[in-house]
A protein has these predicted regions:
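Catalytic "initiation/cleavage/transfer" segments centered on a nucleophilic residue
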Residues: 2-8, 12-20, 29-60, 141-230
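Signature for HUH/AEP ssDNA processing cores
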Residues: 53-119, 125
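A structural signal for short, well-ordered beta-strand segments and their strand-loop junctions
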Residues: 67, 132, 174-178
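Short, solvent-exposed secondary-structure capping/transition elements
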Residues: 77-79, 104, 129-131, 142-149
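Short intrinsically disordered coil segments
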Residues: 82-85, 136, 150-153
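Histidine-centered divalent-metal-coordination microenvironment in nucleic-acid enzymes
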Residues: 118-144
Length: 230
């Protein structure tokens, strides 16, 4: 029979590389299912994810949420900041400005609904030490109801993301092929008040986004954050 010491050794309560972070085990968090097969998770990250979604729904009754992955190019000389958190800060600064600019333009025609950009990101180190970012972006669905189509000639959410990532890396936008990845079924339409006969996309979203909160493949001790929210 396991005693308390055995249990703690088998299931540590704190992250061994950052004891400020607490580990979360199990299949759910505050009533939402999570991807337990990739756990354990960082409890603080799960809390921040839920808080960010709650803030978006508190501000807007209808929210468009979607997943994006950003990668660094190989075989290309990049500035030193590309390997630090500065690059993702530059990305969101550019992306937010693009949304603000678009809302200002549509406001001139009397159509602006307003849109605060909210987000969650995680920085992970993959095979061969390759750094990449997983993102969840949340927008006012009365302002933006879809992310658009990859490769479209029209300006859409994907083209704004590509331009912002190119600018963050200091590269031409035509080199973004393969560096901006939109996962399958990336979009989630969530409502403050669940509509009758509509599936629970909020629960689906939290399950999907819980992947960003997992302990594995994050780097600590390099003075760079592995996770942040707006």
């Amino acid at each position: 029979m396991l005693n308390d010491t055995d249990t703690i050794q088998r299931y540590p309560l704190r992250h061994p590389a950052n004891t400020n972070l607490h580990l979360h085990y199990g299949e759910a968090f505050e009533g939402f299912l999570i991807q337990s097969e990739v756990g354990p998770f960082i409890r603080e990250y799960l809390s921040d994810l839920k808080r960010t979604i709650d803030l978006a729904l508190a501000e807007y009754p209808r929210v468009l949420a979607y997943r994006v992955d950003l990668r660094l190019p190989q075989g290309v000389d990049l500035p030193d900041f590309a390997y630090t958190n500065q690059v993702i800060s530059r990305f969101f600064e550019s992306f937010t400005k693009k949304i603000q600019y678009h809302q200002e333009r549509v406001a001139e025609r009397g159509y602006s609904r307003g849109c605060k950009v909210r987000y969650v990101w995680s920085r992970e180190i993959g095979q061969g030490g390759r750094q990449h970012y997983h993102l969840l972006i949340l927008l006012n669905r009365d302002a933006y109801y879809t992310i658009g189509r990859l490769g479209s000639d029209r300006v859409n959410m994907i083209s704004r993301i590509e331009e912002s990532w190119a600018g963050a890396l200091g590269l031409p936008v035509d080199l973004m092929t393969g560096l901006v990845h939109i996962p399958k079924n990336a979009e989630y339409l969530i409502d403050r008040v669940k509509r009758q006969g509509k599936g629970d996309e909020l629960a689906d979203l939290f399950y999907r986004a819980s992947y960003l909160c997992k302990k594995a493949t994050k780097s600590y001790g390099d003075r760079q954050r592995g996770f942040a929210t707006s």
